[in-house]
Amino acid sequence: VSGALYHRRLFQQDYVCMYRQHHPLMKAGMSSRDFLNVEHLIVSTQESPYDKINQSLEKAGIKANASFTVPHFSAVPYIVSTTNLVVIVPQKLALSAATPFRLAYSKPPIKLPTLQTNIFWHRRFAQDEGNQWLRGLLVECFADT
């Protein structure tokens, strides 16, 4: 980040393994072997930070068992709720999608990085009243501290 930009952390969250309720192969505390044997939905993006998740999955051997890929998270709950595919998503997405889509989620059996969400603004807007108001609103609505 250049010296011209300021930032503030809003929240951090873990990634979780999300799947449809009553998935025949998924259970809390699943083994790495079980996790590797299920078919995975991959969110195929080169944008940071999710590219680090795909790298972690590839190291664990998941790419070879990727049955389907999508370019964005928006379709993920619809796909996972009607298939036996498993996907790695940010925990807040899993939490909001679980009830309406009849999904379940659990901690994945492989180590994944934590996702940090920040807001950024250019220094020329640091004293702008509208920008300050918007930043304050974002912090009020989304910050975990």
Show which residues each predicted segment covers.
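Hydrophobic hinge/microswitch elements
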Residues: 46-104
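Active-site-adjacent beta-strand anchor residues
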Residues: 18, 42-43, 69, 87, ...
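A late-sequence structural motif
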Residues: 20-22, 26-32, 93, 103-145
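Alpha-helical segments flanking ligand/cofactor-binding loops in enzyme cores
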Residues: 8, 33, 77-78
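Secondary-structure junction motif
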Residues: 3, 25-27, 39-60, 127-131, ...
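Short beta-strand-centered segments that line the small-molecule binding cleft or hinge
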Residues: 1-15, 19, 104-106
